[in-house]
Design a protein with these regions (language model features):
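C-terminal "post-core" interaction segments
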Residues: 1-189
């Protein structure tokens, strides 16, 4: 964080992972608010919230695309709906199911859906995805010619949009820091 004015979190092509891991990561960026709730078929609801343990309150932008799914959607939805980050990119995949592996007597396993998750505002994103605040798609040619070493550089068009969005947020914050006629002297100095 030393010297950073803001952050770009890249969740593009992140297929997800563990529910608990996404909650832990969200708690590093959120001081308050709901992160996610899960609802079982029986209607049992479990709400998970931030714990006041955010590592920073500096502005952030999150990059998402159609490859962002499951746990990465939990994280991006929590940051967006708690007004902690702007989402840039393309609509996410839309996997809003909580699954568990059940062991079978022959030693094999079976994946079973045990619940669905909802964003902080109660939105079921399964098969719908999460829409970005700022749409930014790669062209067919750019996707075909893209090299991994260009990720997060000026050759990455979605990253350039994320940087521009972050700069706009930082500029707006600086313009709000000093308001003539206000008692906001500390911010003005």
């Amino acid at each position: 964080e030393q010297g950073a004015q803001g952050y770009v979190l890249d969740l593009r092509s992140n297929p997800g992972g563990l529910l608990e891991a996404s909650i832990d990561i969200a708690r590093q960026w959120l001081n308050e608010g709901t992160i996610v709730s899960t609802r079982t078929r029986e209607g049992i609801r479990d709400v998970r919230r931030a714990t006041g343990s955010a590592i920073t309150d500096k502005p952030m932008v999150v990059l998402i695309d159609q490859g962002s799914a499951s746990a990465s959607e939990i994280l991006s939805g929590a940051l967006q709906e708690n007004k902690r980050a702007q989402l840039v990119g393309q609509k996410t995949f839309g996997k809003g199911l909580v699954q568990a592996v059940r062991g079978l007597s022959d030693g094999s396993g079976m994946t079973v859906t045990i619940a669905k998750y909802l964003t902080p505002n109660g939105t079921d994103i399964h098969k719908n995805g999460i829409k970005p605040d700022v749409e930014a798609a790669m062209s067919e040619k750019e996707m075909r010619d893209f090299k991994i070493e260009n990720l997060g550089t000026s050759k990455d068009s979605q990253y350039r949009v994320a940087e521009t969005t972050l700069i706009k947020v930082l500029t707006m914050q600086k313009n709000e820091a000093y308001r003539p006629g206000s008692a906001n002297l500390e911010a003005a100095l």
